[in-house]
Amino acid sequence: MPHRNDRRKSASKAPNAIIHGRVASKKTIKKQLRNGKYSLKRLAEKGIHLDDIAMEIDNASKKNISKDKSLNENLFGKTEAGKQKDFMNIEPTCKGTILGAPPAL
């Protein structure tokens, strides 16, 4: 029984296909596009049209950017703007502020 990605079998089915190695699935191509290995323009030049996938890739990359920001804040602490914002938010209490200053009258 031939292997799943046998060279002879794939060459006889599609002579213009990539003969060496495995042929990437749509899911793999999506991942590689997201990671920057391919560009939609270069794939279109080769004859691969993934216009319907482009929207999904854009949405997924935006989600990854927001995840990366929160991950960076967790790993490396807050950014300078975040630290400044937290520093400026001092809520008064009955016995003064959190910093110990007398309450404003």
UniProtKB/Swiss-Prot annotation:
One of its GO terms (biological process) is ribosomal large subunit biogenesis. One of its GO terms (cellular component) is nucleolus. It comes from the Eukaryota. The keyword Zinc does not apply. Residues 1-11 have a biased composition (Basic residues). It is found in: Nucleus, Nucleolus. Transmembrane segments: none annotated. Keywords: Nucleus. Residues 1-20 are annotated as: Disordered. Belongs to the ALB1 family. This is Uncharacterized protein C2D10.19c. It comes from Schizosaccharomyces pombe (strain 972 / ATCC 24843).
